[in-house]
Every structure is written in C-alpha cells, then in structure tokens.
Amino acid sequence: MVRGLFIGRFQPPHWGHVWAIKAILSEVDEVIIVLGSAQFNYIEKDPFTVGERIWMLREGLREGGVDLSRVIIVPVPNIENNAAWLSHIKSYLPPFQVAYTGNPFVAMLLKEGGVEVRQQPIFDRGKYVSTRIREMMIKGDSTWRELVPNSVARIIDEVKGVERLRVIITGEAEPHRW
C-alpha cells in the first residue's frame, strides 16, 4: 500500500484542495491530510478552529465524491524549529511513502529528511487560494461561495465565519496587543 502526505492549513478548504486530493488519490492508496497550524484560530490568517477545518474538509471531500475511507485527517500544531519539523509531524502520522507539496520550503525540508516529494496538483492557483477567499469574505464579495464546496459555505455560515473574520481584522483578536 502506498500512502501519500498532503499538508495544508485549509483556511478554508476550497475546490482546489478537493481536486488536488482527488488527483493524489489517483496515484496512492490513501492520503494523510495534515491540517497544519492546528493550534491557531481566531486570527486573520487562521480564522477557523482545527475542529471546524476537519468538519469543512470532510464535508467538502464528501461533496466532491472522495472516498473518505481512503483519507486520514490529522491536525498537527506548528513548531518553531524547522530542523525538527519533519520529525515532529512524523510523530503524529502513520507511515507514508510520498509527500505532495507546492511549497518549495516544505519540499526542501521533506527531501532533506529523505522523503520522496511530488509536485502538488494545482488547479487555477490564481482563483483557488484560501487567502483570496478570506479577503473576499471580508470585503463582502459573496462570489467566494463559488470557490468552495456548498457544504463548506454552509459550515462557514453556521459558525458565522464571515462575521468572525470581520471582527478579527479590527485587531481586537490579537491578545498579545491587549
């Protein structure tokens, strides 16, 4: 069995993520999806909790026709020691044989650790970007909904994610500034 690794923050998950995961699953038997920065939430870059991201990702993948029995979702908190990063994430995961990333820095760390790295499938990178989707939410551009599965949009509505982002950007969501 070949198990692949795909790391992201998924803030929020969008169709590009779903399509990338489907493409990865065409090459491997199972995919481990690491929800990185698991400890961060309620900040502009990471507005959703890890629990919300697991929920959104599972529902988005289900909506996209992904066989969830082939998917392992694991939240992993960041560490500030890049040299120890790979050992850190491996301690959270079952074994994997290949990793998919579009991030050159992550690819470097993985390769230095002896991991086979493949280019992450990317679908219309200019359109399907979580940062852009969050910016659209903040600006009141409702077309962000076209970029995420309907189930993800419903969850964002349920947790009042757009309202949360708008409060977060006021700066009051940064305890280190209080």
Curated annotation (Swiss-Prot):
HAMAP family: NMN_adenylyltr. One of its GO terms (cellular component) is cytoplasm. Belongs to the archaeal NMN adenylyltransferase family. GO terms for biological process: NAD biosynthetic process. The lineage of its organism: Archaea, Thermoproteota, Thermoprotei, Thermoproteales, Thermoproteaceae. Its main location: cytoplasm. It is an enzyme of class 2 (transferase). InterPro entries: Cyt_trans-like (IPR004821), NMN_Atrans_arc (IPR006418), Rossmann-like_a/b/a_fold (IPR014729). GO terms for molecular function: ATP binding; nicotinamide-nucleotide adenylyltransferase activity. PANTHER family: BIFUNCTIONAL NMN ADENYLYLTRANSFERASE_NUDIX HYDROLASE, PHOSPHOPANTETHEINE ADENYLYLTRANSFERASE. Pathway: Cofactor biosynthesis; NAD(+) biosynthesis; NAD(+) from nicotinamide D-ribonucleotide: step 1/1. Coiled coil: none annotated. It catalyses: beta-nicotinamide D-ribonucleotide + ATP + H(+) = diphosphate + NAD(+). It comes from Caldivirga maquilingensis (strain ATCC 700844 / DSM 13496 / JCM 10307 / IC-167). Keywords: ATP-binding, Cytoplasm, NAD, Nucleotide-binding, Nucleotidyltransferase, Pyridine nucleotide biosynthesis, Transferase. This is Nicotinamide-nucleotide adenylyltransferase. Its EC number is 2.7.7.1. It is found in: Cytoplasm. SUPFAM superfamilies: Nucleotidylyl transferase.
